[in-house]
Regions:
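Bacterial N-terminal signal peptides that target proteins for export
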Residues: 1-9
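C-terminal motif of bacterial Sec signal peptides marking the signal peptidase cleavage site
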Residues: 16-19
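A catalytic-pocket lid/entrance helix-loop region that shapes and gates access to the active site
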Residues: 211-213, 218-297
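Catalytic-loop region of hydrolases
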Residues: 22-110, 123-126, 133, 274, ...
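Gly/Ala-rich beta-loop-alpha elbow adjacent to hydrolase catalytic centers
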Residues: 200-205, 209
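Cap/lid segment of the alpha/beta-hydrolase catalytic domain
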Residues: 108, 116-194, 237-238
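Glycine-rich His-Gly loop
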Residues: 86, 116-119, 228
Length: 297
């Protein structure tokens, strides 16, 4: 076991999809100059209203997923960053539905929507999914067009709740708008819609997946909704508050006296727990490899 959170359902989905072919025929790969030009042209050709777009082209062989320093490089891809429906909220703060969409040169005809988590407020790196472990290639590396959204606000606190529209955006509207805009931009870039579309998320992202399955069931061909955080106003919130209080009690402080919650448990603490889990659960999946994959054991 590695002392970090993974999402087995998402990993299973991506593993299955990696074994599936894309659309009929091999993925089309354009030369770098043509791909960069097509990336730039997205802005003028998108046709999206009330939307500001910026694009940047990442040549093949120049970047790995996320901040990884080893492993396979990503294919050439276009990163589209957008802000939809910009406005000033009732609290005087600026709001917009932000999203990041990565469009690979070797597109396999498939689209993956990465769910968020917590209060959202940040754009997930679409070159890297939290489900990647044990050498699993990133979705972008497999040829997926991949999108994430900040859910209509910036910052991970819940202060956006003071604005009624921001609450609606976080509940469902931003995810709807992002899905529709993403498919439109995919059509702009490749000249056709995705052959298959998928959503993958856990906790807050799991709630988003459940929301899609109820409100917009035609958007995706498959949804993984891991540990959906649905009744957050009930006991789950009280439990989270209690956990935060306890973490504050043991976490070290920075130079300004603020608690560093990410260091509430030291590396030796995490390794102690990981070793205990490995000793009990690792072999249950048939392979001793520091990965406890048989969650039902």
């Amino acid at each position: 076991m590695n002392p970090r959170i993974t999402t087995p359902a998402s990993a299973l989905l991506l593993a299955m999809l990696a074994g599936c072919g894309g659309s009929d025929g091999a993925p089309a790969v354009l030369d770098a100059k043509a791909s960069e030009a097509a990336c730039t042209d997205i802005i003028s050709k998108s046709g999206l209203s009330a939307t500001t777009l910026t694009t940047s082209y990442v040549p093949a062989g120049t970047k790995r997923p996320g901040t990884l320093t080893t492993g396979d490089f990503l294919p050439g891809h276009c990163v589209v960053t957008g802000a939809m429906n910009p406005r000033t909220g009732v609290d005087g703060k600026p709001y917009a539905i932000g999203f990041q969409l990565s469009l690979p040169d070797n597109w396999n005809g498939r689209f993956l929507y990465l769910g968020g988590g917590g209060n959202d407020g940040t754009l997930r790196d679409t070159s890297l999914s939290s489900s990647i472990s044990g050498g699993t290639p990133s979705p972008l590396g497999q040829g997926f067009a991949v999108v994430s959204t900040d859910a209509g606000h910036t910052g991970t606190s819940a202060s956006f709740g003071a604005d009624p529209q921001a609450r609606i955006d976080h509940a469902y509207n931003s995810y709807d708008k992002t899905a529709v805009a993403s498919k439109s931009l995919i059509s702009t870039r490749y000249g056709r819609k995705p052959d298959y579309s998928y959503f993958s998320g856990c906790s807050g992202g799991g709630r988003q997946g459940m929301m899609f399955s109820q409100r917009f069931p035609d958007y995706f061909d498959g949804i993984t909704a891991g540990a959906p955080a649905m009744r957050v106003s009930s006991g789950a919130t009280v439990a989270a508050m209690w956990n935060t209080i306890q973490f504050n009690a043991i976490a070290p402080q920075d130079a300004s006296g603020n608690r560093i919650l990410s260091k509430a448990f030291s590396n030796s603490d995490l390794r102690l727990v990981a070793n205990a889990v490995n000793a009990t659960c690792d072999a249950a999946d048939g392979v001793v490899d520091d990965l406890a994959q048989n969650v039902n054991a």
